Every structure is written in C-alpha cells, then in structure tokens.
Amino acid sequence: MTFTASSSSCAITESPVVVALDYHERDKALAFVDKIDPRDCRLKVGKEMFTLFGPQLVRDLQQRGFDVFLDLKFHDIPNTTARAVAAAADLGVWMVNVHASGGARMMAAARDALAPFGKDAPLLIAVTVLTSMETSDLRDLGVTLSPAEHAERLVRLTQQCGLDGVVCSAQEAVRFKQVFGAAFKLVTPGIRPAGSEAGDQRRIMTPEQALSAGVDYMVIGRPVTQSVDPAQTLKDINASLKREA
C-alpha cells in the first residue's frame, strides 16, 4: 500500500504507537512498512538503519505517509548538536532526540535551532537513562542514584531547557506526569504486549499499562515487526488502547 506523504506539522494518526524499525536490509524494512497503515502508527529510525541507508530511507517512509521519529540521540558540543537537530528538521521528521546528559547549554542550543521552523518543527525530546540500564550500571559510571532518581534529575533539566519531553521508562511515567505536567511528552521504549519476551529491555510494560501510567508515545519493536500479521497486530494494540482509555 502507498500513501501520500504528510508534513511534520500535520500528523495523520492519533495512535501513540511508534514502531521501531530494526532491519539490516532496506528492502526488508520497506517490505514490512508496505504491510502496515500509517494511520495505525509512526515509525522510528535508529542509528544502525540511518547509518546504513541515510536520509533517503526517511524520505522513503515519508513518501508512504509515515511520521518518522529520528532516534539518533545527539550528544555533542552545543553548536554541532544544534546543526544536527536543524538538519533533522530540514528532513521533515516528526520527532528527534538528544542526550540530556549533554547538559543545559547543548539542549538549549538544540531548542533554539528549531525556532525558525515554527509549527513545522519536530518534537524535541531528551534521553535520560537508557531502559537497559540498572542501578549497578549507573554505579559503574560513578552515579550513586537509582535509575529513577537520576532520570528525574535529567528530566527536570530538560524541562527547564524548554524541550518538549523525554524518553523514560514506563515505571517512571506516573511520577513524571505528576511532577512535570500533562503537556510534557513522555516517550517510552520497552513496551511489549502481554506474552512477548523482554529482549534487551529491562524495565518493560504492556501498552495498556503504559497508557495508564501516562505515556504519550510508546515504542514497540519486534512484537510488531516479527508478527506474522503486523497490520492486524497494530490494529489489536490500538483497539486495546482505546478500550483502556
């Protein structure tokens, strides 16, 4: 199926589902995408696929009608990060992210770089603590806080810098919504329908649990991309979310 591309300022789906594309071959990725409907989800392109296939892959997805979350987690000096974020906006992506650990000046520079794009600017979110990390991993880095405590500190900094939201674990979402407000977007990986394997994500929830926790956008990968009927899987997930709402 082929759909007309939409601009980043005019989303064609209200679904909170973002499907993570993790393919080694471009043709297989596009074959999967052609099985699903852009009204049922958005798509996430990460570092591996973007490194392999570049901006043209994003354009291919947009031409099929999908909003794209460019998940490159920029983390560099402020000027370099700002230029990278502006380049992502030029590409027309729906969402782009940076590492909150890059600091306030870096995040503010990224925010300012999007000002010229006005209503067409992508959502700018920050990564706090990767969902694969546990307390022991943070301790190895010299951080004595728990993942939730460290993440909350970074979330506070992110909001102070004027970004649109953060990537966080579903377990952290309840408190973050209470503390940082409904308008501050929460994007959560590690979301898997009941019965799915945990994979390399440590802090996981089902889509229904994530919605109840206050998650705005939930990233789902293999349970959809490896489904024998991904279109139906997406429809089932969205139907369950509507019942939960």
From Swiss-Prot:
EC number: 4.1.1.23
Ligand binding (substrate): 22, 44, 71-80, 131, 192, 201, 221-222
Catalytic EC class: lyase
Coiled-coil intervals, chain numbering: none
Superkingdom: Bacteria
Database matches in SMART domains: OMPdecase (SM00934)
This protein's record includes keyword Acyltransferase: no
GO cellular component term, pick one: cytosol
Recorded catalytic activity of this chain's protein: orotidine 5'-phosphate + H(+) = UMP + CO2
InterPro entries reported in the protein's UniProt record: Aldolase_TIM, OMPdecase, OMPdecase_AS, OMPdecase_bac, OMPdeCOase_dom, RibuloseP-bd_barrel
NCBIfam families reported in the protein's UniProt record: PRK00230.1, pyrF
Similarity field: Belongs to the OMP decarboxylase family. Type 1 subfamily.
Protein name: Orotidine 5'-phosphate decarboxylase
Organism: Salmonella choleraesuis (strain SC-B67)
Gene of this entry: pyrF
